[in-house]
């Protein structure tokens, strides 16, 4: 189980690829991976961005040894090699197939948590799955790395020069800070996710 391996600090590229190879069966349309951002998420696990910032200057890490190693691994996913990735460019007009995932033909699908609310929970209700039928796990750690590295999302809010609504801008920033820092607000938001969007204590 990937989550058990993660909790033990053993969820690595090699363990993930081992599972992927066991699961994948192209002749029966079974593929280990699907999703839009699979490549970027795996590259992030190297701990090196493709373009970095050093001493205030942009630098290319495209020739970094770990990124090259990751690219070599990703190349094996292709339909011309080990076929570990669902060939969405051939089968589904470049779109991930959530139906294939729901039918048990995809082992790992990379996506955002909001996709659960939009799509996956509906499959769960329709198929009457138990709470533990759907689970999330971080991307695996690069073998030999010192820790787990993941992509991050950063939001930025800019105040437009000449704007006449400075108070509204301040209120918006404050509301965002409050919702992300206040424990009571976070607890209420979590409960709303459970009540309205079918999240549960295991997700």
Please report, for each region that a protein language model flagged, where it lies by residue.
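Short, solvent-exposed loop/beta-turn-alpha elements that line the ligand-binding surface or hinge
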Residues: 5-8, 49-69, 126, 141-148
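Extracytoplasmic/periplasmic solute-binding protein
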Residues: 9-60
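Stable alpha-helical elements in mature extracytoplasmic
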Residues: 12-19, 38-39, 67-74, 97, ...
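Glycine-centered hinge/linker elements that transmit conformational signals in sensory
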Residues: 13, 17-22, 53-92
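Short helices/loops that flank or line small-molecule/ion binding pockets
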Residues: 17-22, 94-109
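Loop/turn elements at helix/coil->beta-strand transitions in domains of secreted/extracellular proteins
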Residues: 24-31, 82, 103-107, 129-135, ...
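Beta->alpha turn/N-cap motifs
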Residues: 36-38, 111-120
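Extracytoplasmic/periplasmic substrate-recognition and gating elements
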Residues: 123-194
